[in-house]
């Protein structure tokens, strides 16, 4: 990884000590679990109870999967849960222009014909029906020198000559964008997607491996015995086409890692995090079966910005070894910019758990090992990694035994452990003492590999900790645990996107409201570049900006805290900022989040709807 210091701060005590921030003396008048905000910034007689301020942090791990998967029961199936009214449908234009006429100078042939097409072929009528353009220059045109949205662009005035009826193109900027790696990668071609949909895709690696994995199912209680039986029957035994030593090298030592995050961990967010110092990013969780069905929504998830690679991982969830093997092969062949393939064994969402995916795999180690074996054999030179929790039940940790089994199979390049059980969720702090115990197991395994002639040449298994990292002190305390190579940051990087800048500076950065707004503006530009500058793209960008602001508004400026360090699980009383903008950025009212989006995306249309996810269980119980 680039820009990673050779020595950690703890190895240079004098220097690190000098850089530590001044810690105010502790005051006991704050109730347990309440953020210690200075008295002059606390709002008297608040209109919002403390308990009702925030969305559920479990949603960052499962996001809209619960809504999407739960909606497969037909049109009239009742919506369940606290947020029955959460409707994410976005608005469309009153008059829809046929896509064949996006560029009036170079029209394409409409496959339906002008008379039969349900969209308009009258350019003048379309332009006159459009709402007033958004002020400023088109973010897409500014970034890449042309605008694929053409006449549909909401900033059309900035790249359209009304007199000549021509769209403008900046050829110099087109070349600059390529030189600056300003483009997206891992896009599956339409013909490959069609072959998946028609079940005609060729899985040369997975098809060899699946019969071998099937043979292991016969005796899951004793995998070693099953392997011996399979070897005796040469007709069913297949050697894995790739071994761990033949994979790309994966070095996560001291890397600044952003956790896989569903919904909020989208491409614009990850791209923003790369500009703020992140070394490693991950896709949103993709489900293996929809990938194999060639669905557009699922294949949108492995897409990445070119600046994310190297250091970009694709995360998948599955419950079947055949699906895992095939999905791994498809990603290897169709997504050319992937540094690692991560198996999600930590998602706590009930729906996936009931389907045997996510954290449910921790309860079925034999199935988990088969899945990892299938992925490893079918993913070409892409190393396979796994993300787990301490266990599925509270006060019953199982990760130690599971990690020992995973290591013995030698199928993964890295293991990430979230210091919580599935049942515990976010009501208590992560158990870093248990993370340390598991780190010792991985460290011992790596030491044994050094003494083993057969395994000596293979890469050591990286171990990454995860849970409640919100400050540079949290980060360094974690990476200085023996055996912990690095830390994966989730909520901390959503609430405070500049966390890695603080890690680099080894101090708290009291960002002004203006600086924070600039970051949000950068996100808006990246969002428009990704989703498009037409009405639909702007609606998507606005919706995901609101999801993002649903986390960033939780940041409490360090300058208004009575003592440090801040903690993720502390609930703040209602507070006001040092200026109006800071107060607005900390607002818990989603209508204020929409106002913030309007600073960059223009006025929200009357049909735009956004309802935040349901209340949170993310805070310590007082």
From Swiss-Prot:
Keywords from the UniProt entry: Cytoplasm, Flavoprotein, FMN, Metal-binding, mRNA processing, NAD, NADP, Nucleus, Oxidoreductase, Repeat, tRNA processing, Zinc, Zinc-finger
Record's compositionally biased regions (Basic and acidic residues): 1-31, 50-72
Disulfide bonds: none
Chain residues that bind FMN: 260-262, 315, 387, 418, 466-468, 490-491
GO BP terms in the entry: mRNA processing
Chain positions covered by the region annotation Disordered: 1-92
Chief place where the protein resides: cytoplasm
Substrates-to-products reaction catalysed: 5,6-dihydrouridine(47) in tRNA + NAD(+) = uridine(47) in tRNA + NADH + H(+); 5,6-dihydrouridine(47) in tRNA + NADP(+) = uridine(47) in tRNA + NADPH + H(+); a 5,6-dihydrouridine in mRNA + NAD(+) = a uridine in mRNA + NADH + H(+); a 5,6-dihydrouridine in mRNA + NADP(+) = a uridine in mRNA + NADPH + H(+)
Any Pfam family matching the protein: Dus
Record bears the keyword Flavoprotein: yes
Function: Catalyzes the synthesis of dihydrouridine, a modified base found in the D-loop of most tRNAs. Specifically modifies U47 in cytoplasmic tRNAs. Catalyzes the synthesis of dihydrouridine in some mRNAs, thereby affecting their translation.
Similarity annotation: Belongs to the Dus family. Dus3 subfamily.
Record's protein name: tRNA-dihydrouridine(47) synthase [NAD(P)(+)]
Organism from which the protein derives: Debaryomyces hansenii (strain ATCC 36239 / CBS 767 / BCRC 21394 / JCM 1990 / NBRC 0083 / IGC 2968)
